[in-house]
Amino acid sequence: MAGGKSPKGMFAARKLRLKRLKFRWHQRKFKRRMLKLKEKFDPLEGAPMARGVVLEKVGIESRQPNSAVRKAVRVQLVKNGRIVTAFVPGDGGVNFIDEHDEVVIAGIGGTLGRSMGDLPGVRYKVIMVNGVSLDALYKGKKQKPVR
């Protein structure tokens, strides 16, 4: 374990530990966590979900080699006023959403909190509309309340 410049003596534990702590700053995850970079730059401010108001419906062209228009919505977050694009999952899901509806968005589940699959630049997905889950609306278990 000890490298060429590492102390190898019987009482070298403190020195080895301090050296390890210093080199942790070269690790990307450690640096992001310690400097709280996610909370600073993430529109959701580190939270798993956020509430927002739908501004418009948009169609996003998928990346190569696929060819499709994926349905999404532009959402203005209540907590900080930032505008993000959120994917609407499911077949015909965008029909349940109108402008000025209140939606809850969550991360889409891409690597390192980034976009997923063939959706360029979309990091979030819609999970609730006006307090009713999108899943319940699909299955016909509940109807969307009129605001």
From Swiss-Prot:
GO BP annotations listed: translation
Cited CDD domains: Ribosomal_S23
Disulfide bond annotation, renumbered to this chain: none
Keywords: Ribonucleoprotein, Ribosomal protein, RNA-binding, rRNA-binding
InterPro entries listed in its UniProt record: NA-bd_OB-fold (IPR012340), Ribosomal_uS12 (IPR006032), Ribosomal_uS12_arc (IPR022863), Ribosomal_uS12_euk/arc (IPR005680)
GO terms of molecular function: rRNA binding; structural constituent of ribosome
NCBIfam families: PRK04211.1 (NF003254), uS12_E_A (TIGR00982)
Stored HAMAP family: Ribosomal_uS12_A
Oligomeric form and interacting partners: Part of the 30S ribosomal subunit.
Function: With S4 and S5 plays an important role in translational accuracy. Located at the interface of the 30S and 50S subunits.
Annotated family: Belongs to the universal ribosomal protein uS12 family.
The protein's name in its UniProt record: Small ribosomal subunit protein uS12
Gene this chain is encoded by: rps12
